[in-house]
Regions:
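Conserved lysine of the Walker
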Residues: 36
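Hydrophobic positions on the alpha1 helix immediately C-terminal to the Walker A/P-loop
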Residues: 39
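A glycine- and Lys/Arg-enriched "phosphate-lid" helix/loop adjacent to the NTP-binding pocket
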Residues: 126-193
Length: 385
């Protein structure tokens, strides 16, 4: 089995001190039978070897189920109290471990086996609003402000059905049958929707090689921690849409490039969907010919407007409509550009390995493969002509 290589030869001792006072809290979530348990073990091993103290918080609903909670109860009062207690313990665990991490003498990272918004996927929105109000918090605080990154592992029920099983989690309620697969896919979608809007939500595809899925998790956490990593190109295609698309998450995006030093790319992105707005500031810095450091942070509206004053005068703001969807276990983003001289629609894959085939949906007609074609980088599309 091919193992995840350690990071390229870099001076970790020079980098780790800057991470000491910037503890990251990361959610590892996903649909049923997505591979979270294995991923957590590998995350501990990999980042411990790099000098990190890795705290992995257990899945709270599983703890509650083992202690006697019945999430399928028909008693609404019992269900409400159980879900409210689940959220309270989830937040308390995270806060206590953050205090512990701050007291460590080495850099630390907190990885949560599911996070607060996962709880919302298993109830009606009205009950979730009541619970958050009674706990003294809001959806915006829990989804947008609490965690540095959310990594969603797609359920094996979507694209890797041959590996779907319930034997590794006795508390799992969806059976390993056609109906169970349907329920698992539905839960997978509901969890993604619950986290949609977080500035660093990443969907980790299913792969023919499960090891590739684990490598993707480690790569994304490496990115969140601000450690150098090899530069990789996601596959991109100019496409036309033919026929009806499946359920997708639709959003409008404005992307502005700011004035930056040579070798540094600074981007300000605003994403608007269903009346909600999230702003993300991203910096990409080359540290060698084949390595880069990417840092992302969510910014409030006031800071967004202030940073817009630093817009690169030689580049226009890119405006596009994005439809995000999963097809046969693979995650896609379909961007339709709205303010370019010529119509342009680009389909981008996420996390598909070089030796893996892209499973194009039947409603997509590929016109050209533009992977690695710098002409179609957003940074270059934004150039004023």
């Amino acid at each position: 089995m091919r193992q995840m290589a350690l990071l390229p030869a870099i001076d970790h001792h020079a980098i780790l001190p800057s991470i000491m006072n910037n503890i990251k809290r990361i959610v590892l979530t996903g649909g049923p039978c997505a591979g979270k348990t294995t991923a957590l073990v590998r995350v501990i091993e990999h980042f411990s070897n790099l000098g990190f103290k890795v705290f992995t918080l257990p899945e709270v609903p599983t703890m509650f189920t083992q202690a006697g909670m019945n999430y399928l109860t028909q008693n609404p009062d019992f269900f409400y109290e159980g879900e409210k207690a689940t959220l309270e313990i989830q937040l308390a665990l995270e806060d206590k471990f953050l205090r512990m991490a701050e007291a460590c003498n080495e850099p630390a990272v907190i990885v949560c086996d599911r996070g607060a918004m996962d709880i919302s996927a298993y109830m009606q929105p009205e009950m979730w609003e009541r619970i958050t109000r009674d706990v003294g918090t809001t959806t915006q605080q829990l989804r947008d402000e609490r965690y540095d990154a959310v990594l969603h592992l797609v359920s094996a029920a979507d694209g890797a059905e041959q590996f779907y099983t319930t034997s590794n989690n006795a508390s799992r309620n969806e059976p390993a049958s056609e109906e169970g697969l349907r329920i698992a896919r539905l839960l997978d979608k509901k969890v993604i929707e619950a986290w949609t809007g977080h500035g660093h939500l990443r969907v980790i595809n299913n792969h023919e090689d499960f090891e590739a899925k684990i490598r993707r998790v480690i790569k994304e956490i490496t990115n969140v921690l601000g450690l150098p990593q090899p530069i990789e190109e996601e596959r991109k295609y100019i496409v036309e849409v033919e026929g009806e698309m499946p359920d997708c998450i639709e959003s409008d995006i404005t992307q502005t490039y700011l004035v930056a030093d040579p070798g540094v790319e600074v981007r300000l992105r605003r994403r608007d969907w269903s009346g909600k707005v999230v702003n993300v500031h991203t910096t990409k810095k080359r540290v060698s010919g084949h390595e880069e450091i990417i840092t992302e942070r969510q910014v409030p509206n006031a800071l967004y407007e202030s940073l817009m004053q630093q817009a690169d005068p030689y580049r226009q703001t890119i405006r596009k409509n994005r439809k995000s969807f999963i097809w046969k276990g693979q995650y896609f983003e379909l961007d339709t550009y709205l303010n370019l001289p010529e119509p342009l629609t680009i389909l981008e894959t996420k996390g598909i390995t070089e030796d893996e085939d892209v499973r194009f949906p039947p409603f997509i007609r590929v016109l050209a493969d533009i992977t690695c074609n710098k002409k179609y980088y957003n940074y270059n599309l934004a150039l004023r002509r």
